[in-house]
């Protein structure tokens, strides 16, 4: 479990890694188990082998093109087959990392010889345990991708599934290129980008930056001369962090065009809602930086593109864990003082839902609203994360400037959403801020998995239109009424009346028994307090 939507990153080495909200992590650490609906398991059979200049990012782009940004909801994708065996761990990471963009619960590769090789490179081969699919095991669905048939792809604005071949994209001037991120910053990724750029220079009107994923990779890139190649080409290095993806480090100009190797290109995510963000592989990003418009490695290197296939991950990295802060022994940990600065305010705790709810619709959104839309993550907002009263003023800041004041003035309200509401980051502030502003429920056509969990944890009732057509019958600022709410929650079906339109419609609650208990308590904190009290009583008996 990880409090980050890209926790499935670890699926590349055979781990079942699931992204959840921070409250879920904290709850599990108290000893209360995490529960989730049993996902479907989809087999993805990979055949063939990637051609030089074609990155494993093309695999996940192809998946997104087929599955879409919401089609993976409730699924685990298991990558197997002869093609999977050809992919090194760093290549697999790109695929499992971006599986989150499909809405998937997680993605996973077998723990095979490629994983053994990776563990050996980290001095941990003795900890390797082979874990392969059982012979003849059954899946809930199957897909197939021939790696040999893939070509360089590009995700166009403003969704990661808006994928087409680079050869088909409209050529336009590019002002920024970013190489790196948690998706594509391995040794081989950066080395290949450097080889593409060797002997060339970044185009005159392009700013190109690079962020390497780890110190050990950075060190090796310097030793092997690849870092120098990038510097000679006019590339600037940034600090290793999530920053460049969310406008900390390099934000595009107004109506600018930026090409990035990261995993999301939501409108405004890079800091400027007027800009266009395109996603590509490191090889294509390097080529684009040189030409000044969308390009591939083969266009730059010609026959020499074959040299890219010679770059592999290292047999051994220099291991230096000196900067890792390790946990204290339990007895010492008890004495640790928690220091809270003046900008850290207590977390608001919602009340249990009332039995009769009358509230106006404070906001009606379009499809595919992301948690970035709800709570931005760039530099000017990140410093507010521990101060909910302050940060809530910027809730939906990039979507509706008046939302915060409107919701606050209403006292209590309801948000109506379209398909895939709350996609993207696991950012629980996207639930905390609306809760603080009095939002009692979200009624949508569909809700992204992690965000739905965060809504439950913070006492906001997630509801789904029983008939999606009812979305069109109601409007922002209509007053909705729900009678006998608590009893209806228990049945998982709620009848809602729009008092302004004089129409009635139904919504359903796709929640487990434990999630229902949490909602009826008013959120995870109240539920957890109750659970711990019960556990103490049992212990005394």
List each model region and its residues.
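Fe-S-dependent hydro-lyases/dehydratases of central metabolism
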Residues: 1-541
């Amino acid at each position: 479990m990880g409090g980050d939507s890209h926790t499935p990153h670890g699926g590349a080495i055979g781990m079942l890694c699931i992204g959840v909200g921070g409250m879920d992590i904290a709850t599990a650490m108290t000893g209360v188990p995490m529960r989730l609906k049993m996902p479907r398991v989809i087999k993805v059979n990979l055949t063939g082998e990637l051609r030089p200049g074609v990155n494993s990012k093309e695999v996940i782009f192809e998946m997104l093109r087929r599955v879409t940004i919401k089609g993976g909801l409730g699924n685990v994708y298991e990558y197997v087959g002869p093609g999977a065996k050809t992919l090194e761990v760093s290549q697999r990471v790109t695929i499992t990392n971006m599986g989150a963009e499909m809405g998937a619960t997680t993605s996973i590769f077998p723990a095979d010889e490629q994983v053994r090789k990776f563990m050996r490179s980290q001095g941990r081969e003795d900890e390797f345990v082979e874990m392969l699919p059982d012979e003849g095991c059954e899946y809930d669905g199957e897909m197939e991708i021939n790696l040999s048939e893939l070509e360089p792809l590009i995700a166009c604005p403003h969704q990661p599934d808006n994928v087409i071949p680079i050869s088909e994209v409209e050529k336009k001037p590019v002002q920024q290129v970013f190489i790196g991120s948690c998706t594509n910053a391995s040794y081989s990724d950066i080395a290949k980008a450097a080889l593409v750029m060797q002997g060339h220079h970044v185009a005159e009107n392009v700013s190109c930056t690079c962020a390497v994923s780890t110190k050990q990779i950075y060190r090796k890139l310097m030793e092997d001369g690849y870092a120098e190649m990038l510097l000679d080409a006019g590339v600037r290095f940034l600090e290793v962090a999530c920053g460049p993806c969310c406008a900390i480090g390099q934000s595009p100009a107004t109506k600018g065009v930026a090409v990035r190797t990261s995993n999301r290109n939501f409108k405004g995510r890079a800091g400027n809602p007027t800009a266009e963000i395109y996603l590509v592989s490191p090889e294509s990003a390097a080529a684009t930086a040189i030409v000044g418009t969308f390009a591939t490695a083969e266009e730059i290197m010609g026959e020499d593109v074959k040299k890219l296939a010679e770059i592999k991950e290292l047999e051994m990295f220099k291991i230096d864990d000196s900067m890792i802060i390790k946990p204290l022994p339990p007895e010492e940990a008890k004495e640790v003082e928690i220091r809270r600065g003046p900008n850290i305010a207590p977390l608001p705790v919602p009340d249990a839902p009332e039995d009769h709810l009358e509230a106006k619709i404070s906001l009606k959104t379009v499809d595919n609203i992301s948690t970035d839309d709800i709570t931005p993550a760039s530099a000017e907002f990140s410093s507010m994360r521990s101060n909910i009263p302050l940060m809530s003023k910027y809730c939906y800041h990039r979507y509706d400037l008046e939302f915060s004041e409107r919701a606050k003035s209403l006292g209590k309200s309801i948000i109506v959403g379209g398909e895939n509401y709350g996609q993207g980051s696991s950012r629980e502030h996207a639930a905390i801020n609306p809760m603080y502003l009095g939002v009692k429920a979200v009624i949508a056509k569909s809700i992204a998995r992690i965000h739905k969990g965060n809504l439950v944890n913070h006492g906001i009732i997630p509801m789904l239109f029983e008939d999606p057509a009812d979305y069109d019958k109601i409007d922002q600022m209509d007053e909705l009424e729900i009678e006998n709410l608590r009893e209806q929650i228990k049945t998982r079906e709620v009848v809602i009346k729009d008092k302004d339109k004089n129409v009635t419609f139904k919504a359903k609650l796709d929640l487990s028994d434990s999630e229902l208990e949490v909602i009826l308590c008013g959120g995870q904190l109240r539920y957890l307090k109750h659970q711990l009290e019960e556990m103490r009583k049992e212990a005394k008996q």
